[in-house]
UniProtKB/Swiss-Prot annotation:
It holds the Pfam family PfkB. It catalyses: 5-dehydro-2-deoxy-D-gluconate + ATP = 6-phospho-5-dehydro-2-deoxy-D-gluconate + ADP + H(+). Keywords: ATP-binding, Kinase, Nucleotide-binding, Transferase. It comes from the Bacteria. This is 5-dehydro-2-deoxygluconokinase. PROSITE patterns: PFKB_KINASES_2. Its EC number is 2.7.1.92. NCBIfam families: myo_inos_iolC_N. One of its GO terms (molecular function) is ATP binding. It comes from Geobacillus kaustophilus (strain HTA426).
Amino acid sequence: MSFLPFDQQKPLDFIAVGRLCIDLNANEIHRPMEETMTFTKYVGGSPANIAIGMARLGMKTGFIGRVADDQMGRFIVRYLKNNGIDTSHVITDKSGSVTGLAFTEIKSPTDCSILMYRDNVADLKLEPNDIDEDYIRRAKCLLISGTALAKSPSREAVFLALDYARRHGTVVVFDLDYRPYTWQSKEETAIYYNLAAEKCDVIIGTREEFDMMERFDGQRRDDEQTARKWFDYNAKIVVIKHGKDGSIAYTKTGETFVGTIFPANIVKTFGAGDSYAAGFIYGLMNDWPIPKAMEYGAAAASIVISSHSCSDAMPTLAQIEQFIEQHRNGSAARK
């Protein structure tokens, strides 16, 4: 059953809009940041990772965003190009902005944290004039993420992209991607997240992210109640993630699916959500049953958290299928 109206006549499969930054992952693991001396540089940012994941899976992928006019910005653009991502709408910001940096601390496979440098970052300089209506018209799917809503003018640019997508029948996926350090308050966050989510076809986030969005709703909802709220707007599918306990997908037609949980040799917890999103969206775009899309998303997540990198570790289709074949014990099930 097809849940989403992907227009197969459109020439571009997938566009992501938003954050492009640098991850600096600790090489000396099992120690605090204060004692870590060396880091390895990777392209980062949830929309960037998801776009890279989609490109690795063979999708014609583009990106809309801004990078700083510095060595890190040029590194990001070159990396995207080398991964087959169209960068014609990645703009070099000339205002003196900088590239966002994320230093990761890996004390243990389950005790990881991030030290962020996000002052005056280029990705939040994205302007409405940077959003090309025809570019979005030509895409089957647009991905937005919550961090891009945190400040103007990026916030307005994302809402314009949403309007163009709805005007031209481009399916919109909202990766909630809540990063509290980017926002002024939880109240501000909830307001803009809700305004964006009302316009989206697929919403993917953790239980904690949905709780943040519902802070004005009076009482805590369970997963099914949360999903039903968004079905009253434009959502067709809502996915609520529960970390190591897996994910649950709800459809507007009333179905519920519990996702596969795969074992992993966990190195760090970062990147699981991004790789899950890429695998899941890929499945939806190929009109797979939702349980199969969830299975591929879960497998991709297990692969990435077993690796030092996020972007470099985004798997190909063959790698996901090989991983699933090796772990055939789990399955996604209709609830």
